[in-house]
Regions:
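Interfacial helix-loop-helix junctions of multi-pass membrane proteins
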Residues: 37-43, 79-100
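Alpha-helical transmembrane segments that form the membrane-embedded catalytic/substrate-binding core
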Residues: 49-53, 90-109
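Small-polar-interrupted transmembrane alpha-helices in polytopic inner-membrane proteins
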Residues: 17-28, 67-84, 99
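"…centered on the first transmembrane helix and the immediately adjacent amphipathic helix/loop
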Residues: 1-55, 72
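Short, charged juxtamembrane terminal tails flanking transmembrane helices
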Residues: 114-118
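Membrane-helix interface segments
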Residues: 11-15, 61-68, 91-92
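Short helix-capping/hinge motifs at transmembrane helix termini and TM-loop junctions
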Residues: 30-31, 62, 87, 113
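Structural signal for the C-terminal ends of transmembrane alpha-helices
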Residues: 57-62, 107-113
């Protein structure tokens, strides 16, 4: 039997989403020992992380994209607000990168569904 990543993601989207939420939370709230080498490079990390977060849920439930944006945007906002309490700093640009990542993940999932013909 051939392995199809899209089918795997669709089947295990909840577990994948929970693991991504845990990973994002750990990386976002771990205290920094030093600033990133390239200023602003963390925006790419935010974009990719939140695109990855939105993709599985959007692939499984493409009509629920509005709920996905609201839920994960609230999560991202709470993470940014919590960062000053763990020797980090929250930024509006990080939150904007999170939102762009969510949109990217949703668009990629919708494109995947359309290409697959589902």
């Amino acid at each position: 039997m051939k392995f199809y990543p899209i089918n795997f993601i669709s089947k295990y989207w909840r577990a994948i989403s929970i693991m991504l939420l845990l990973g994002i939370t750990l990386f976002s709230l771990a205290p920094l020992t030093e600033l990133p080498e390239a200023p602003g490079s963390d925006k790419t990390h935010h974009l990719v992380a939140y695109a990855a977060l939105a993709y599985p849920a959007s692939l499984r439930r493409p009509t629920g994209w509005k709920s996905i944006i609201i839920l994960f945007a609230l999560y991202g906002g709470l993470i940014e607000m919590a960062q000053p309490y763990v020797n980090r700093y929250g930024e509006w640009l990080d939150f904007a990168a999170n939102l762009l990542g969510l949109l990217l993940g949703i668009l990629l999932a919708l494109g995947t569904k359309k290409a697959k013909g589902a």
